[in-house]
């Protein structure tokens, strides 16, 4: 058991018969009344995000998540194959299980596969990934004065807003948490 006062971003807990990951939390001490913790939780099974309020000092069960380093091998229809780097055991996940992460996955990429009591919950990609621009409008001389952006399609099909100086074939660093352009690689 863990106290809600000890919440940290990324902590996994068991609440209401679900496995939840703490995305955000805030300790609130109103002028009148008892303190409480307002949190934003993501269900690791369904991906649903829910806001939940706990009384200060309330205890919740900590979920012991197994985190294995694996390599993304390939996709075959709606099935995506991963390989354990130590045992070379292969694992297949459906598109529905890793829908959000697919926008950032490239073949041979190292990821963390999360499981709870033998049930695979999903995939964690690195905080930033390097992806190649496959399609974007060419930058026109003089455009950069305004510091604007233009859409660019990346090798995984993800579309992001990028500065005007980015061209097709450029390798970009993308933040996987927000899906935003960070820099050129």
UniProtKB/Swiss-Prot annotation:
Coiled-coil features, chain-numbered ranges: none
S-S pairs: none
One GO molecular function term of this record is: translation elongation factor activity
Q: Which UniProt keywords apply?
A: Cytoplasm, Elongation factor, Protein biosynthesis
Q: Which SMART domains match?
A: EFP, Elong-fact-P_C
Q: Name the SUPFAM superfamilies for this protein.
A: Nucleic acid-binding proteins, Translation proteins SH3-like domain
Pathway(s) this gene product operates in, as recorded in its UniProt entry? Protein biosynthesis; polypeptide chain elongation
Query: What GO cellular component term, any one, is given?
Result: cytoplasm
Query: Please, one GO biological process term?
Result: peptide biosynthetic process
Compartment list: Cytoplasm
Q: Which InterPro entries match?
A: Elong-fact-P_C, NA-bd_OB-fold, Rib_uL2_dom2, Transl_elong_fac_P/YeiP, Transl_elong_KOW-like, Transl_elong_P/YeiP_cen, Transl_elong_P/YeiP_CS, Transl_elongation_fac_P
**What's this chain's function?**
Involved in peptide bond synthesis. Stimulates efficient translation and peptide-bond synthesis on native or reconstituted 70S ribosomes in vitro. Probably functions indirectly by altering the affinity of the ribosome for aminoacyl-tRNA, thus increasing their reactivity as acceptors for peptidyl transferase.
The family line of this record is:
Belongs to the elongation factor P family.
The record's annotation in PANTHER family points to: ELONGATION FACTOR P, ELONGATION FACTOR P (EF-P) FAMILY PROTEIN
**What is this protein's record name?**
Elongation factor P
In which organism is this protein found?
Halalkalibacterium halodurans (strain ATCC BAA-125 / DSM 18197 / FERM 7344 / JCM 9153 / C-125) (Bacillus halodurans)
Gene behind the chain: efp
């Amino acid at each position: 058991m863990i106290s809600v006062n000890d919440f940290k971003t990324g902590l996994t807990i068991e609440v209401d018969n679900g496995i939840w990951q703490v995305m955000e939390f805030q300790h609130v001490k109103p002028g009148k009344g008892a303190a409480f913790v307002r949190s934003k939780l993501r269900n690791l099974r369904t991906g649903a995000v829910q806001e939940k309020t706990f009384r200060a000092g309330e205890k919740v069960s900590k979920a012991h998540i197994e985190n294995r380093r694996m390599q993304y091998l390939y996709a075959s229809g709606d099935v995506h194959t991963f390989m354990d780097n130590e045992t070379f055991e292969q694992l297949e996940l459906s598109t529905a299980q890793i829908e959000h992460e697919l926008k950032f996955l490239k073949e041979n990429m190292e990821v963390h596969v999360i499981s709870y009591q033998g049930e695979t919950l999903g995939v964690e990609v690195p905080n930033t990934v390097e992806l190649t621009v496959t399609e974007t409008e060419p930058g026109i001389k003089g455009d950069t004065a305004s510091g604007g952006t233009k859409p660019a399609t990346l090798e995984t099909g993800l579309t992001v807003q990028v500065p005007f100086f980015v061209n097709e074939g450029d390798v970009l660093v993308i933040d996987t948490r927000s899906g935003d352009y960070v820099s050129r690689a």
